[in-house]
């Protein structure tokens, strides 16, 4: 006998993915520590843990998409959860990046004698902010405009236009990442070159990591839009991706001003 549901909430079925994700995280942590201390088998355990985590992410999100798209479990009330959950997640990422900005500002405003008492430190050849960084700025901001275009297209029910906009967004993101990689390759300093190199590569690298994650997020949204999964009433996943991408845009502006321009004077 099937009982009727008299509420708008989704009661999920028992799932093995939380425990499998926990085991993957445990293997990754232990393997990472073993690898850093040159223990035998550390690299193997680390690799297996990462593979297990990636597999768990794939099958777990597959189940969520199936429940929302095919089974219709994600009502308007259920959709509020992912929406509200995305906000503190993005705020936590802002705080993470704020720590890198703080480290850079502290080191530049009060340079120690170990780095010559000046900023940038003695012997560091900084990157010109008006070359690749300046070129990357309109590229990334244009990708943010394209994702907004995609959002308006979804709300208007124009599926093909939304796909085109997402293709433009992802293409610009890949160009940005390519230029960033070129800049790293040509950089005259490394992450081990004083506090300047450490804060530069940590801040820009962490932002670049977010760009890559956001690009993958938008690629999935583009595939789902092409398959007809996203509608003007139901596109929470895309909204989360768009918010995340705008967060990446704003952080880049702060990076350009504080790390590249002001930090390199």
Swiss-Prot record:
How does this protein sit in the membrane? Multi-pass membrane protein
Going by the UniProt record, its keywords in alphabetical order are: Membrane, Mitochondrion, Mitochondrion inner membrane, Translocase, Transmembrane, Transmembrane helix
**Gene name of the encoded protein:** COX3
Q: Name one GO biological process term.
A: mitochondrial electron transport, cytochrome c to oxygen
Transmembrane stretches, by residue range? Answer: 16-36, 41-61, 84-104, 115-135, 137-157, 162-182, 200-220, 245-265
Q: Which reaction does it catalyse?
A: 4 Fe(II)-[cytochrome c] + O2 + 8 H(+)(in) = 4 Fe(III)-[cytochrome c] + 2 H2O + 4 H(+)(out)
Of which family is this protein a member? Answer: Belongs to the cytochrome c oxidase subunit 3 family.
Q: What is this protein called?
A: Cytochrome c oxidase subunit 3
The entry lists its GO molecular-function terms as: cytochrome-c oxidase activity
The job of this chain, per UniProt, is described as: Component of the cytochrome c oxidase, the last enzyme in the mitochondrial electron transport chain which drives oxidative phosphorylation. The respiratory chain contains 3 multisubunit complexes succinate dehydrogenase (complex II, CII), ubiquinol-cytochrome c oxidoreductase (cytochrome b-c1 complex, complex III, CIII) and cytochrome c oxidase (complex IV, CIV), that cooperate to transfer electrons derived from NADH and succinate to molecular oxygen, creating an electrochemical gradient over the inner membrane that drives transmembrane transport and the ATP synthase.
Q: Which PROSITE patterns does the UniProt entry name for this protein?
A: COX3
Gene3D superfamilies with a match to the protein in the record: 1.10.287.70, Cytochrome c oxidase, subunit III, four-helix bundle
Q: Quaternary structure?
A: Component of the cytochrome c oxidase (complex IV, CIV), a multisubunit enzyme composed of a catalytic core of 3 subunits and several supernumerary subunits. The complex exists as a monomer or a dimer and forms supercomplexes (SCs) in the inner mitochondrial membrane with ubiquinol-cytochrome c oxidoreductase (cytochrome b-c1 complex, complex III, CIII).
Localization of this protein: Mitochondrion inner membrane
* Gene Ontology CC annotations of this record: mitochondrial inner membrane; mitochondrion
Q: What is its EC number?
A: 7.1.1.9
């Amino acid at each position: 006998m099937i009982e009727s549901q008299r509420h708008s909430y989704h009661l999920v079925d028992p799932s093995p993915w939380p425990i499998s994700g926990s085991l993957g995280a445990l293997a990754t942590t232990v393997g990472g520590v073993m690898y850093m201390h040159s223990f035998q088998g550390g690299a193997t355990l680390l690799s297996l843990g990462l593979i297990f985590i990636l597999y768990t992410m794939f099958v777990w999100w597959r189940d969520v998409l199936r429940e929302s798209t095919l089974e219709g479990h994600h009502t308007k009330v259920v959709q509020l959860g992912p929406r509200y959950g995305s906000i503190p997640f993005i705020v936590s990422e802002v705080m993470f990046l704020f720590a890198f900005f703080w480290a850079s500002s502290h080191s530049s405003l009060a340079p120690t004698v170990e780095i010559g008492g000046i900023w940038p430190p003695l012997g560091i050849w900084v990157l010109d902010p008006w070359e690749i960084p300046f070129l990357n700025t309109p590229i990334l901001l244009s990708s943010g405009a394209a994702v907004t275009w995609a959002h308006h297209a979804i709300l208007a029910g124009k599926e093909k236009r939304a796909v085109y906009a997402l293709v433009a967004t992802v293409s610009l993101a890949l160009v940005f990442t390519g230029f960033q990689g070129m800049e790293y390759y040509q950089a005259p300093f490394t992450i081990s070159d004083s506090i300047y190199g450490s804060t530069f590569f940590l801040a820009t690298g962490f932002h670049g990591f977010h760009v890559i994650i956001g690009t993958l997020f938008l690629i999935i949204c583009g595939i789902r839009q092409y398959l007809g999964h996203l509608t003007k009433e139901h596109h929470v996943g895309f909204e989360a991706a768009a918010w995340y991408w705008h967060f990446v845009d704003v952080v880049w502006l702060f990076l350009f001003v504080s790390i590249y321009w002001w930090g390199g004077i």
